[in-house]
Amino acid sequence: MAGKPILHYFNGRGRMECIRWLLAAAGVEFEEKFIKTPEDLDKLTNDGSLLFQQVPMVEIDGMKLVQTRAILNYIATKYNLYGKDAKERALIDMYTEGVADLGEMILLLPLCPPNEKDAKVASIKEKSTNRYLPAFEKVLKSHGQDYLVGNKLSRADIQLVELLYYVEELDPSLLANFPLLKALKTRVSNLPTVKKFLQPGSQRKPPMDAKKIRRSQEYFPD
């Protein structure tokens, strides 16, 4: 029997959080080995565990996978969260890339200089409500199904719902005009595996502040 996946990253959201969400939604238990010092990262690099000298890195099925999208693709394929054919996978990829675009803006917001933060927040809100959220609402409305692709839960739904939580952290009112997205968020959040992940004490990570992000950037190469 294969062991649990082992996630190597720092103790924060960053680029590992979407992987945590996907594993949790798939009902997969995982272990975490947190990188706490530059020496921890050096050890992984020196023993050849990090192909591009970068994290996230996930040990799974005898592999040491790096690159967030590659990790997500493997997990989604392994646990049947990646569509039934090439067309569905293309749609899932398209939607998750849109999720990643907006998610990246929110992820990096704490690093924004204080004198620019209000403008950056306003820009993110504008893009959320005028570009990204309407697009996903339109997809759901176009086919009237419960999930984005093939009327079946996929990584696109999981990653979108993760993003919706971040959008609400930024401003709870941003979802007000998107009833289908709110319904999707409720639907996915009530899945037993996701519901468990959303409970206090799970491996889900809290929002990151600028201090924590900068500290991690000191020894995590881009």
Curated annotation (Swiss-Prot):
Catalytic activity, reaction form: RX + glutathione = an S-substituted glutathione + a halide anion + H(+); prostaglandin A2 + glutathione = prostaglandin A2-S-(R)-glutathione; prostaglandin J2 + glutathione = prostaglandin J2-S-(R)-glutathione; (13S)-hydroperoxy-(9Z,11E)-octadecadienoate + 2 glutathione = (13S)-hydroxy-(9Z,11E)-octadecadienoate + glutathione disulfide + H2O
GO BP term, example: glutathione metabolic process
Chain residues that bind glutathione: Y9, Q54, V55, Q67, T68
GO cellular component: cytosol
Residues carrying N-acetylmethionine: M1
Keyword set includes Transferase: yes
Domain of life where this protein originates: Eukaryota
Name of the protein in question: Glutathione S-transferase alpha M14
InterPro entries, A to Z: Glutathione-S-Trfase_C-like, Glutathione-S-Trfase_C_sf, Glutathione_S-Trfase_N, GST_alpha, GST_C, GST_superfamily, Thioredoxin-like_sf
Biased composition (Basic and acidic residues): 206-222
Function: Glutathione S-transferase that catalyzes the nucleophilic attack of the sulfur atom of glutathione on the electrophilic groups of a wide range of exogenous and endogenous compounds. Involved in the formation of glutathione conjugates of both prostaglandin A2 (PGA2) and prostaglandin J2 (PGJ2). It also catalyzes the isomerization of D5-androstene-3,17-dione (AD) into D4-androstene-3,17-dione and may therefore play an important role in hormone biosynthesis.
